[in-house]
Amino acid sequence: IPYWTYNHGDEPLVAISLLDTSNIANQLDSTPRVFYLGGNPETEFPETQEEQQGRHRQKHSYPVGRRSGHHQQEEESEEQNEGNSVLSGVSSEFLAQTFNTEEDTAKRLRSPRDERSQIVRVEGGLRIINPKGKEEEEEKEQSHSHSHREEEEEEEEDEEKQRSEERKNGLEETICSAKIRENIADAAGADLYNPRAGRIRTANSLTLPVLRYLRLSAEYVRLYRNGIYAPHWNINANSLLYVIRGEGRVRIVNFQGDAVFDNKVRKGQLVVVPQNFVVAEQAGEEEGLEYVVFKTNDRAAVSHVQQVLRATPAEVLANAFGLRQRQVTELKLSGNRGPLVHPQSQSQSH
Protein backbone atom coordinates (compact mmCIF):
# COMPACT_ATOMS: atom_id res chain seq x y z
CA ILE A 1 0.00 0.00 0.00
CA PRO A 2 1.64 3.32 -1.04
CA TYR A 3 2.31 5.89 1.64
CA TRP A 4 4.45 8.99 2.20
CA THR A 5 5.90 10.63 5.31
CA TYR A 6 6.63 14.30 6.00
CA ASN A 7 8.50 15.78 8.96
CA HIS A 8 6.86 19.11 9.83
CA GLY A 9 8.79 19.53 13.10
CA ASP A 10 11.95 21.43 13.96
CA GLU A 11 14.06 18.35 14.73
CA PRO A 12 15.24 15.38 12.64
CA LEU A 13 12.85 12.44 12.63
CA VAL A 14 14.10 8.87 12.95
CA ALA A 15 11.55 6.25 11.86
CA ILE A 16 11.93 2.49 12.21
CA SER A 17 10.00 0.23 9.83
CA LEU A 18 9.26 -3.39 10.67
CA LEU A 19 8.82 -5.61 7.59
CA ASP A 20 6.94 -8.82 8.37
CA THR A 21 7.97 -11.12 5.52
CA SER A 22 6.24 -14.07 7.21
CA ASN A 23 2.85 -12.36 6.90
CA ILE A 24 0.21 -14.49 5.19
CA ALA A 25 -0.28 -11.78 2.56
CA ASN A 26 3.32 -12.26 1.37
CA GLN A 27 3.24 -14.99 -1.27
CA LEU A 28 6.85 -14.57 -2.41
CA ASP A 29 10.01 -15.56 -0.52
CA SER A 30 11.42 -14.08 2.71
CA THR A 31 13.44 -11.42 0.87
CA PRO A 32 12.31 -7.92 1.95
CA ARG A 33 11.15 -5.79 -0.99
CA VAL A 34 10.34 -2.10 -1.06
CA PHE A 35 9.25 -0.24 -4.19
CA TYR A 36 8.83 3.47 -4.88
CA LEU A 37 6.37 5.16 -7.24
CA GLY A 38 8.59 8.23 -7.64
CA GLY A 39 12.12 9.48 -7.31
CA ASN A 40 15.36 7.59 -7.86
CA PRO A 41 15.76 5.70 -4.57
CA GLU A 42 18.89 3.93 -3.49
CA THR A 43 18.85 0.17 -3.00
CA GLU A 44 17.68 -0.60 0.55
CA PHE A 45 18.60 -4.30 0.71
CA PRO A 46 21.72 -4.58 -1.49
CA GLU A 47 22.84 -8.00 -0.22
CA THR A 48 19.69 -9.90 -1.13
CA GLN A 49 19.06 -7.95 -4.34
CA GLU A 50 22.59 -8.42 -5.68
CA GLU A 51 22.20 -12.16 -5.13
CA GLN A 52 18.94 -12.15 -7.07
CA GLN A 53 20.42 -10.06 -9.89
CA GLY A 54 23.34 -12.49 -10.16
CA ARG A 55 20.97 -15.41 -10.60
CA HIS A 56 18.94 -13.39 -13.12
CA ARG A 57 22.02 -12.56 -15.24
CA GLN A 58 23.19 -16.17 -15.15
CA LYS A 59 19.78 -17.42 -16.17
CA HIS A 60 19.40 -14.96 -19.07
CA SER A 61 22.97 -15.05 -20.44
CA TYR A 62 23.07 -15.71 -24.19
CA PRO A 63 25.70 -17.47 -26.34
CA VAL A 64 27.96 -15.27 -28.49
CA GLY A 65 26.17 -16.25 -31.67
CA ARG A 66 22.80 -15.07 -30.33
CA ARG A 67 23.94 -11.92 -28.61
CA SER A 68 23.39 -9.57 -31.56
CA GLY A 69 19.79 -10.64 -31.90
CA HIS A 70 19.00 -9.07 -28.51
CA HIS A 71 21.01 -5.87 -29.05
CA GLN A 72 18.06 -3.64 -29.87
CA GLN A 73 15.95 -5.07 -27.05
CA GLU A 74 18.76 -4.41 -24.55
CA GLU A 75 19.11 -0.79 -25.73
CA GLU A 76 15.36 -0.23 -25.30
CA SER A 77 15.54 -1.77 -21.82
CA GLU A 78 18.42 0.50 -20.84
CA GLU A 79 16.49 3.51 -22.13
CA GLN A 80 13.48 2.60 -20.00
CA ASN A 81 15.36 1.75 -16.81
CA GLU A 82 16.95 5.15 -16.17
CA GLY A 83 15.63 5.32 -12.60
CA ASN A 84 14.83 2.98 -9.72
CA SER A 85 11.12 3.74 -9.27
CA VAL A 86 8.52 1.37 -10.67
CA LEU A 87 7.35 3.94 -13.22
CA SER A 88 10.87 4.20 -14.65
CA GLY A 89 10.34 0.78 -16.20
CA VAL A 90 7.44 2.08 -18.32
CA SER A 91 8.01 4.17 -21.45
CA SER A 92 7.09 7.85 -21.33
CA GLU A 93 4.93 7.42 -24.42
CA PHE A 94 2.77 4.79 -22.71
CA LEU A 95 2.52 6.87 -19.51
CA ALA A 96 1.40 9.89 -21.55
CA GLN A 97 -1.35 7.78 -23.11
CA THR A 98 -2.40 6.29 -19.79
CA PHE A 99 -2.58 9.53 -17.81
CA ASN A 100 -3.56 11.78 -20.75
CA THR A 101 -0.64 14.11 -20.05
CA GLU A 102 2.01 15.91 -22.05
CA GLU A 103 5.23 14.10 -22.91
CA ASP A 104 7.25 16.24 -20.48
CA THR A 105 4.97 15.32 -17.56
CA ALA A 106 5.24 11.62 -18.42
CA LYS A 107 9.04 11.86 -18.54
CA ARG A 108 9.11 13.44 -15.09
CA LEU A 109 6.98 10.60 -13.71
CA ARG A 110 9.75 8.20 -14.73
CA SER A 111 12.27 10.26 -12.67
CA PRO A 112 15.16 9.81 -15.14
CA ARG A 113 18.59 10.65 -13.75
CA ASP A 114 17.04 12.17 -10.62
CA GLU A 115 19.92 12.75 -8.21
CA ARG A 116 17.58 12.73 -5.22
CA SER A 117 17.05 9.46 -3.37
CA GLN A 118 14.27 8.43 -0.98
CA ILE A 119 14.30 11.67 1.02
CA VAL A 120 13.27 14.91 -0.70
CA ARG A 121 13.62 18.36 0.86
CA VAL A 122 10.52 20.53 0.47
CA GLU A 123 11.42 24.18 -0.02
CA GLY A 124 9.10 26.48 1.92
CA GLY A 125 7.31 23.65 3.72
CA LEU A 126 4.48 21.39 2.69
CA ARG A 127 1.02 22.97 2.58
CA ILE A 128 -1.76 20.41 2.79
CA ILE A 129 -5.42 20.90 3.68
CA ASN A 130 -6.07 19.22 7.04
CA PRO A 131 -9.11 19.16 9.36
CA LYS A 132 -8.99 21.84 12.03
CA GLY A 133 -8.23 20.85 15.61
CA LYS A 134 -11.70 21.81 16.80
CA GLU A 135 -13.35 19.66 14.16
CA GLU A 136 -11.15 16.73 15.14
CA GLU A 137 -12.18 17.10 18.80
CA GLU A 138 -15.87 17.21 17.88
CA GLU A 139 -15.49 14.10 15.76
CA LYS A 140 -13.70 12.36 18.62
CA GLU A 141 -16.49 13.24 21.06
CA GLN A 142 -19.15 12.03 18.64
CA SER A 143 -17.34 8.75 18.04
CA HIS A 144 -16.97 8.24 21.80
CA SER A 145 -20.69 8.77 22.37
CA HIS A 146 -21.56 6.25 19.65
CA SER A 147 -19.06 3.66 20.86
CA HIS A 148 -21.29 2.45 23.73
CA ARG A 149 -24.25 1.88 21.43
CA GLU A 150 -22.04 0.11 18.90
CA GLU A 151 -20.67 -2.22 21.60
CA GLU A 152 -24.20 -3.14 22.67
CA GLU A 153 -25.22 -3.81 19.06
CA GLU A 154 -22.12 -5.97 18.50
CA GLU A 155 -22.93 -8.03 21.60
CA GLU A 156 -26.47 -8.62 20.35
CA GLU A 157 -25.16 -9.62 16.90
CA ASP A 158 -22.68 -12.07 18.46
CA GLU A 159 -25.41 -13.69 20.52
CA GLU A 160 -27.68 -14.02 17.48
CA LYS A 161 -24.81 -15.42 15.40
CA GLN A 162 -24.02 -18.00 18.09
CA ARG A 163 -27.66 -19.11 18.23
CA SER A 164 -27.85 -19.43 14.44
CA GLU A 165 -24.59 -21.41 14.28
CA GLU A 166 -25.96 -23.89 16.79
CA ARG A 167 -28.85 -24.62 14.41
CA LYS A 168 -26.61 -25.05 11.30
CA ASN A 169 -25.26 -28.37 10.12
CA GLY A 170 -22.28 -26.67 8.47
CA LEU A 171 -21.28 -29.37 5.98
CA GLU A 172 -24.41 -29.43 3.79
CA GLU A 173 -24.78 -25.66 3.74
CA THR A 174 -21.18 -24.82 2.88
CA ILE A 175 -20.12 -27.67 0.56
CA CYS A 176 -23.03 -29.65 -0.84
CA SER A 177 -25.20 -26.67 -1.76
CA ALA A 178 -22.39 -24.25 -2.55
CA LYS A 179 -22.55 -22.25 -5.76
CA ILE A 180 -19.68 -23.44 -7.95
CA ARG A 181 -20.26 -21.60 -11.24
CA GLU A 182 -20.11 -17.92 -12.20
CA ASN A 183 -20.16 -16.30 -15.65
CA ILE A 184 -17.56 -13.57 -15.26
CA ALA A 185 -17.70 -12.77 -18.99
CA ASP A 186 -21.27 -11.47 -18.62
CA ALA A 187 -21.20 -7.82 -19.68
CA ALA A 188 -24.21 -6.97 -17.50
CA GLY A 189 -22.26 -7.68 -14.31
CA ALA A 190 -19.10 -5.72 -15.12
CA ASP A 191 -17.34 -4.19 -12.11
CA LEU A 192 -15.50 -1.59 -14.22
CA TYR A 193 -16.65 -0.34 -17.61
CA ASN A 194 -15.48 2.20 -20.17
CA PRO A 195 -17.52 2.24 -23.40
CA ARG A 196 -14.39 3.06 -25.42
CA ALA A 197 -11.76 1.02 -23.57
CA GLY A 198 -13.39 -2.18 -22.26
CA ARG A 199 -14.70 -3.85 -19.13
CA ILE A 200 -13.51 -5.86 -16.09
CA ARG A 201 -15.30 -8.32 -13.83
CA THR A 202 -13.93 -10.11 -10.78
CA ALA A 203 -14.94 -13.37 -9.12
CA ASN A 204 -13.74 -13.86 -5.54
CA SER A 205 -14.93 -15.45 -2.30
CA LEU A 206 -17.41 -12.60 -1.82
CA THR A 207 -19.23 -13.31 -5.08
CA LEU A 208 -18.45 -17.04 -5.23
CA PRO A 209 -17.93 -18.28 -1.63
CA VAL A 210 -16.56 -21.68 -2.67
CA LEU A 211 -13.36 -19.92 -3.79
CA ARG A 212 -12.52 -19.42 -0.13
CA TYR A 213 -11.70 -23.13 0.15
CA LEU A 214 -9.55 -23.00 -2.99
CA ARG A 215 -7.88 -19.71 -2.01
CA LEU A 216 -8.24 -18.52 -5.58
CA SER A 217 -9.95 -15.69 -7.44
CA ALA A 218 -10.26 -14.66 -11.08
CA GLU A 219 -10.46 -11.45 -13.09
CA TYR A 220 -11.95 -11.24 -16.57
CA VAL A 221 -10.71 -8.39 -18.76
CA ARG A 222 -11.91 -7.44 -22.22
CA LEU A 223 -10.09 -4.55 -23.87
CA TYR A 224 -11.44 -3.01 -27.06
CA ARG A 225 -9.08 -1.94 -29.85
CA ASN A 226 -6.23 0.19 -28.44
CA GLY A 227 -7.83 -0.04 -24.98
CA ILE A 228 -5.48 0.16 -21.98
CA TYR A 229 -5.70 -1.42 -18.54
CA ALA A 230 -3.56 1.18 -16.75
CA PRO A 231 -0.58 0.20 -14.54
CA HIS A 232 -1.61 -1.69 -11.39
CA TRP A 233 -0.35 -4.37 -9.02
CA ASN A 234 -1.72 -7.15 -6.82
CA ILE A 235 -1.12 -6.44 -3.14
CA ASN A 236 -1.59 -9.97 -1.82
CA ALA A 237 -1.46 -12.43 -4.71
CA ASN A 238 0.56 -13.83 -7.57
CA SER A 239 -1.33 -14.00 -10.85
CA LEU A 240 -1.44 -15.99 -14.07
CA LEU A 241 -2.67 -14.17 -17.18
CA TYR A 242 -4.17 -16.35 -19.93
CA VAL A 243 -5.14 -14.81 -23.28
CA ILE A 244 -8.51 -16.04 -24.56
CA ARG A 245 -8.85 -14.01 -27.76
CA GLY A 246 -7.17 -11.26 -29.71
CA GLU A 247 -3.71 -9.80 -29.33
CA GLY A 248 -2.03 -6.98 -27.46
CA ARG A 249 0.98 -6.00 -25.37
CA VAL A 250 1.75 -6.71 -21.71
CA ARG A 251 4.26 -4.66 -19.72
CA ILE A 252 5.60 -5.82 -16.33
CA VAL A 253 7.95 -3.87 -14.03
CA ASN A 254 9.55 -5.31 -10.88
CA PHE A 255 10.06 -3.56 -7.54
CA GLN A 256 13.46 -2.20 -8.67
CA GLY A 257 12.00 -0.40 -11.67
CA ASP A 258 13.28 -2.94 -14.22
CA ALA A 259 11.05 -3.75 -17.19
CA VAL A 260 11.14 -7.54 -16.88
CA PHE A 261 8.55 -8.16 -19.61
CA ASP A 262 7.40 -5.97 -22.52
CA ASN A 263 6.09 -8.12 -25.37
CA LYS A 264 3.09 -8.85 -27.53
CA VAL A 265 0.73 -11.63 -26.47
CA ARG A 266 -1.92 -13.54 -28.39
CA LYS A 267 -4.53 -16.26 -27.95
CA GLY A 268 -3.38 -19.23 -25.88
CA GLN A 269 -0.35 -17.59 -24.27
CA LEU A 270 0.35 -17.43 -20.52
CA VAL A 271 2.12 -14.71 -18.55
CA VAL A 272 3.02 -15.00 -14.85
CA VAL A 273 2.95 -11.78 -12.81
CA PRO A 274 4.51 -12.00 -9.32
CA GLN A 275 2.99 -10.24 -6.34
CA ASN A 276 3.62 -6.46 -6.22
CA PHE A 277 5.00 -6.33 -9.77
CA VAL A 278 3.42 -3.47 -11.74
CA VAL A 279 1.60 -4.67 -14.87
CA ALA A 280 -0.22 -2.89 -17.70
CA GLU A 281 -2.03 -4.30 -20.73
CA GLN A 282 -3.00 -2.73 -24.06
CA ALA A 283 -5.05 -4.21 -26.89
CA GLY A 284 -3.79 -4.13 -30.46
CA GLU A 285 -4.97 -1.83 -33.23
CA GLU A 286 -6.59 -4.52 -35.38
CA GLU A 287 -8.58 -6.39 -32.73
CA GLY A 288 -9.24 -6.29 -29.03
CA LEU A 289 -7.66 -8.30 -26.24
CA GLU A 290 -9.61 -10.70 -24.04
CA TYR A 291 -7.99 -12.52 -21.15
CA VAL A 292 -8.57 -13.97 -17.70
CA VAL A 293 -6.27 -13.59 -14.70
CA PHE A 294 -6.14 -16.34 -12.07
CA LYS A 295 -4.96 -15.09 -8.65
CA THR A 296 -3.60 -17.03 -5.68
CA ASN A 297 -5.82 -15.33 -3.12
CA ASP A 298 -9.59 -15.66 -2.77
CA ARG A 299 -9.84 -11.92 -2.02
CA ALA A 300 -7.00 -10.51 -4.10
CA ALA A 301 -6.58 -6.76 -3.69
CA VAL A 302 -5.46 -4.50 -6.54
CA SER A 303 -3.91 -1.02 -6.40
CA HIS A 304 -4.07 1.25 -9.45
CA VAL A 305 -1.34 3.84 -10.01
CA GLN A 306 -3.90 6.33 -11.34
CA GLN A 307 -6.02 6.23 -8.19
CA VAL A 308 -2.94 6.43 -5.97
CA LEU A 309 -1.72 9.58 -7.72
CA ARG A 310 -5.17 11.14 -7.64
CA ALA A 311 -5.49 10.54 -3.89
CA THR A 312 -2.02 11.95 -3.17
CA PRO A 313 -1.92 15.66 -2.18
CA ALA A 314 -0.86 18.00 -4.99
CA GLU A 315 2.08 19.40 -3.01
CA VAL A 316 3.45 15.90 -2.44
CA LEU A 317 3.29 15.08 -6.16
CA ALA A 318 4.89 18.39 -7.10
CA ASN A 319 7.87 17.82 -4.81
CA ALA A 320 8.23 14.08 -5.41
CA PHE A 321 8.28 14.31 -9.21
CA GLY A 322 9.46 17.91 -9.70
CA LEU A 323 6.20 18.94 -11.38
CA ARG A 324 4.71 22.39 -11.92
CA GLN A 325 1.23 23.12 -10.56
CA ARG A 326 -0.31 22.91 -14.03
CA GLN A 327 1.25 19.50 -14.56
CA VAL A 328 -0.02 18.25 -11.20
CA THR A 329 -3.57 19.35 -12.04
CA GLU A 330 -3.28 17.68 -15.42
CA LEU A 331 -2.00 14.47 -13.85
CA LYS A 332 -4.65 14.27 -11.12
CA LEU A 333 -7.73 15.36 -13.05
CA SER A 334 -7.28 15.37 -16.84
CA GLY A 335 -8.47 12.02 -18.14
CA ASN A 336 -7.85 10.26 -14.82
CA ARG A 337 -11.28 8.65 -14.74
CA GLY A 338 -10.46 5.05 -14.01
CA PRO A 339 -8.07 2.20 -14.77
CA LEU A 340 -9.60 1.54 -18.22
CA VAL A 341 -8.28 4.05 -20.75
CA HIS A 342 -8.68 4.70 -24.47
CA PRO A 343 -5.90 7.01 -25.75
CA GLN A 344 -7.87 8.59 -28.60
CA SER A 345 -10.93 9.44 -26.51
CA GLN A 346 -8.65 10.80 -23.77
CA SER A 347 -6.88 13.15 -26.18
CA GLN A 348 -10.21 14.32 -27.63
CA SER A 349 -11.58 15.17 -24.17
CA HIS A 350 -8.30 16.92 -23.35
From Swiss-Prot:
Signal peptide: none annotated. SMART domains: Cupin_1. Keywords: Disulfide bond, Seed storage protein, Storage protein. Pfam families: Cupin_1. Hexamer; each subunit is composed of an acidic and a basic chain derived from a single precursor and linked by a disulfide bond. This protein found in the seeds of many leguminous and non-leguminous plants is the source of sulfur-containing amino acids in seed meals. This is Legumin K. It comes from Pisum sativum (Garden pea). The gene is LEGK.
